[in-house]
Regions:
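Basic, amphipathic alpha-helical hairpins
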Residues: 1, 15-28, 47, 51, ...
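An amphipathic alpha-helical interaction segment
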Residues: 1-2, 38
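N-terminal positioning helix adjacent to the helix-turn-helix/winged-helix DNA-binding module
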Residues: 4-15, 51, 59-63
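Residues within helix-turn-helix
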Residues: 30, 41, 77-81, 91-92
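Core residues of bacterial helix-turn-helix
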Residues: 36, 86-87, 98
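Short hydrophobic/aromatic patch on the recognition helix
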Residues: 43, 93-94, 98
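Terminal helix-turn-helix DNA-binding modules in bacterial transcription factors
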Residues: 50-89, 111-115
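…primarily DNA-binding HTH/wHTH and HhH modules…
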Residues: 96-115
Length: 115
């Protein structure tokens, strides 16, 4: 493996570790780039080059995965509580994000999982 490939792999692995630990609070690419001491542009380019997906796609996919898990398993939590658990400022922002990503409102997704 070439030096640049090793560096890119290291950057992705460090990003993924940060993402798993911080996805609830941090949704911005700039935050992850700063933690890795990289410019957002360079950071985004490395992530896309090594994975074929943008850093934003990775962040969104992790958020959606965990949102679906909470909607499916935590019936004691309403949509607003799930929104706050995932770091959204309000349920409207979360609902818009969820629908943009999945095509369904969170309540529709939850209802579809229980029928």
């Amino acid at each position: 493996m070439k030096k640049e490939e090793k560096r890119s792999t290291y950057i992705f692995n460090a990003f993924y570790d940060l993402l798993i630990d911080n996805y609830r609070q941090q949704h911005e690419i700039g935050w992850y780039a700063e933690k890795l001491c990289l410019t957002p542009k360079y950071f985004s380019g490395v992530i896309r080059q090594i994975t074929g997906k943008s850093a934003a796609q990775w962040i969104n996919e992790i958020l959606i995965l965990h949102a679906k898990r909470l909607l499916y398993t935590r019936f004691d939590m309403n949509v607003q509580q799930i929104a706050y658990e995932l770091g959204f400022k309000g349920s409207a922002n979360f609902c818009r994000f969820f629908k943009d990503q999945t095509g369904l409102r969170p309540s529709e997704y939850r209802k579809g999982q229980t029928t």
